[in-house]
Curated annotation (Swiss-Prot):
It comes from the Eukaryota. Residues 217-297 form a coiled coil. This is Protein FAM76A. Residues 161-181, 287-307 are annotated as: Disordered. One of its GO terms (cellular component) is nuclear speck. Keywords: Coiled coil. InterPro entries: FAM76.
């Protein structure tokens, strides 16, 4: 009996192939708790509920520091303290000021002075590195799928060719040697006629090659794979551009919301101050009115007792 392994979420036991590689989750738990990106820091986390769109770390920071602002380097909405996110702050302390990313052209790529840390020799920021690795992984998986499917189709065709050649073998054995000898002079006559006409001729072209069909099929499959790779690369570039635009639009929207919120808070503060000033003036006027009313009463009493 094959060994069973427990899912890290529901703790039910499944075969090893049925669990995911990273989180070791079963299929139902993967559907119920998908891996999503945090709205603020853009890191991937396991979603506990459908309404939960931010990771635990950002949720704690929101409780402590409030809604974050866009980072002045990477434009990610994760600057809880100051104008820079924690990732850019730590990278700046460790590697110095940021450089321009070769993909998104923003000043948010940090040079680690190590070519092994670069992506294909390019200096990319954190977001572009993740997107590039994701696209590369998808391309590898699709190429692997294409190669496996093409290999399976080739194996089927080879089996079919073996079966067909085996079925014809017995019938070909019954051919007489005289018919074979008659065919050879005919081919020689054709060869002599072609050589007499002065055309270049290769004997290998005239003979039947059983593997020619396979070579043609392999060449066609290679061309199809190259075309699909090219189309995939173009689509990946389009996806990267769209993700970049979506990130920029989200950042702009968050920035505008934060600006409007700050403006509303400032207006509420000024309104409160104006109301307090008006109330203070009102109290002073009431005091003055009370003092004036008290001063008029003794004057009236003195005017009555004078005769």
């Amino acid at each position: 009996m094959a060994a069973l392994y427990a899912c890290t979420k529901c703790h039910q036991r499944f075969p090893f192939e049925a669990l995911s590689q990273g989180q070791q989750l079963c299929k139902e738990c993967r559907i119920a708790h998908p891996i999503v990106k945090c709205t603020y820091c853009r890191t991937e986390f396991q979603q506990e509920s459908k309404t939960n769109t931010i990771c635990k770390k950002c949720a704690q920071n929101v409780k402590l520091y409030g809604t974050p602002k866009p980072c002045q380097y990477c434009n990610i909405i994760a600057a809880f303290i100051g104008n820079k996110c924690q990732r850019c702050t730590n990278s700046e302390k460790k590697y110095g000021p940021p450089h321009s990313c070769e993909q998104c052209k923003q000043q948010c790529a940090f040079d680690r002075k190590d070519d092994r840390k670069k992506v294909d020799g390019k200096l990319l920021c954190w977001l572009c590195t993740l997107s590039y690795k994701r696209v590369l992984q998808k391309t590898k998986e699709q190429c692997k799928h294409l190669s496996s499917s093409s290999r399976a189709s080739l194996q089927e065709k080879e089996q079919y060719s073996r079966l067909s050649s085996g079925s014809h073998y017995n019938s070909q054995k019954t051919l007489s040697t005289s018919s074979i000898q008659n065919e050879i002079p005919k081919k020689k006559a054709k060869f002599d006629a072609i050589s007499a006409n002065g055309d270049s001729f290769s004997p290998d072209l005239a003979l039947d090659s059983p593997g020619t069909d396979h070579f043609v099929i392999i060449a066609q499959l290679k061309e199809e794979v190259a075309t699909l790779k090219k189309m995939l690369h173009q689509k990946d570039q389009m996806i990267l551009e769209k993700e970049k635009k979506i990130t920029e639009l989200k950042a702009d929207l968050q920035y505008q919301e934060s600006q409007m919120r700050a403006k509303m808070n400032q207006m509420e503060k000024t309104h409160k101050e104006v109301m307090e000033q008006l109330q203070a003036k009102n109290r002073e006027l009431l005091k003055q009115a009370a003092a004036l009313s008290k001063g008029k009463k003794p004057e009236k009493s003195g005017a009555i007792t004078s005769p």
